[in-house]
Design a protein with these regions (language model features):
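Short, positively charged patches
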Residues: 15-18, 25-27, 45-46, 59, ...
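Conserved phosphate/anionic-ligand binding catalytic regions in large, soluble enzymes, centered on
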Residues: 17-20, 67-78, 234, 238, ...
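Active-site phosphate/pyrophosphate-binding segments
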Residues: 22-29, 34-50, 155-284, 359-388
Length: 388
């Protein structure tokens, strides 16, 4: 491979964009590798997870900081619906300051930690707080850095299962791309309603489609990025709300805050945030695969079209959505979880191209150091067990 997204590798390196381009591009290959890896590691995670998931009193807490938190927020509604289990998603940044408001001390808890570096202060503190406060705590750690503090925490502990994502997922660029999608996919495969064997067919179809999209979408995405929008609103319901939050952050990060972003649900936008839509705004709406939920998506789309205030509108949909020029049918899937990944790929490509269009450096959009790849400056305070 001499480059990515029609860019020469040397040009990308000169623009400090090579890592980001490669890490977005490689994702379909990593997803296939992840499925195979989980099959090979089944003897490690299955004896740990199966007894826990069979307990009807178990609460599953998906947690992380920043993008890692959004992976959980994208999956939690889908997991609740498809498995009937009690699944919630909280930021470690919330849990650390007020653990008693988020951790249920009356129930066995499986804490699922998403972490790229595995060294974020809040991630380690949340795990330690869970073990300190919960009478029955278990940990599934989905990490990208095998040498991280979080991965090392699993050693010699029976209540911890640590799984390292495929090689290459520990992004070297500032923004989380491969790491985010691999951790999200691993949780969907391990905690979802299908076995790995049952998930292979829809996963393979999604991987094949995303391999096509990374080739075919680039001209359209590049034109959007060059259009000059200065505001960006991402919209999606249920699991797509979490994905919209991630897409919003990715644009904010890679454009170093030069493009103002916001996320919401299709129904939530009308309750005030719609004021943000003006003639400098790109609105991105992620359509659900479900007929019922998609009615609400379609109503807002039509309303925004009638308003005529947005600079541009783009819809991302499965092939059941009627086509128009501004709605892109990215993948045919009967389940929202398999739309998460092609939608994510589009939003990552758009943020990357927008960074280049603004003459920024995607691999490190903040070279002056005020915002860092691994968070700095956080002091963790000891939490006394007597505090409630």
């Amino acid at each position: 491979m001499n480059g990515y997204f029609a860019y020469d590798a040397g040009w990308l390196e000169q623009r400090h964009a090579l890592h980001t381009a490669r890490e977005i591009w490689q994702q379909p290959d990593l997803w296939a590798a992840l499925h195979q890896q989980l099959q090979l590691q089944q003897a490690l995670w299955q004896p740990f997870l199966d007894p826990l998931l069979a307990n009807p009193r178990l609460q599953i807490v998906l947690c992380g900081a920043g993008s890692s938190a959004f992976a959980g927020r994208a999956l939690a509604p889908w997991l609740r619906e498809k498995t009937g289990r009690d699944v919630v998603a909280y930021g470690t940044t919330d849990i650390v300051a007020n653990p008693h408001q988020y951790l249920d001390l009356t129930r066995p808890t499986l804490l699922v930690s998403f972490a790229r570096s595995g060294n974020s202060p809040e991630s380690m503190a949340t795990v330690e707080l869970a073990d300190q406060l919960l009478p029955e705590s278990y940990h599934l750690m989905l990490v990208c850095n095998p040498d991280s503090q979080l991965a090392q925490y699993a050693h010699q502990r029976d209540n911890v299962c640590s799984l390292v994502m495929p090689q290459g997922s520990n992004d070297q660029s500032f923004a989380m791309t491969s790491s985010f999608s691999c951790m999200m996919l691993s949780a969907a495969l391990l905690l979802g309603p299908q076995s790995l064997a049952e998930a292979q067919r829809p996963l393979t179809a999604m991987v094949v489609r995303c391999n096509e999209l990374r080739e075919t979408l680039q001209p359209q995405v590049k034109a959007l990025a060059a259009s000059g929008f200065r505001r960006y609103i991402t919209l999606g319901g249920s699991c797509f709300t979490g994905l919209a939050e991630e897409a919003s952050l990715k644009m904010l990060e890679l454009t170093a805050g030069q493009i103002v972003t916001r996320y919401d649900s299709p129904l939530g936008l009308r309750h005030g945030p719609k004021f943000m839509v003006d003639n400098q705004t790109l609105v991105l709406l992620m359509f659900s695969s479900g007929d019922y939920a998609r009615q609400y998506d379609r109503d807002l789309w039509n309303e925004l079209q009638r308003d005529g205030l947005a600079m541009q509108m783009v819809g991302l949909a499965g092939s059941t959505q009627p086509l128009c020029d501004m709605i892109l049918n990215l993948h045919h899937a009967e389940d929202d979880v398999w739309l998460l990944f092609p939608y994510l790929l589009f939003t990552q490509m758009l943020a990357f191209e927008s960074s280049l269009a603004l003459d920024l450096t995607p691999d490190n959009p903040c070279p002056t150091g005020e915002v860092n790849r691994v968070v700095k400056g956080v002091t963790i305070y000891r939490y006394p067990s007597s505090v409630a």
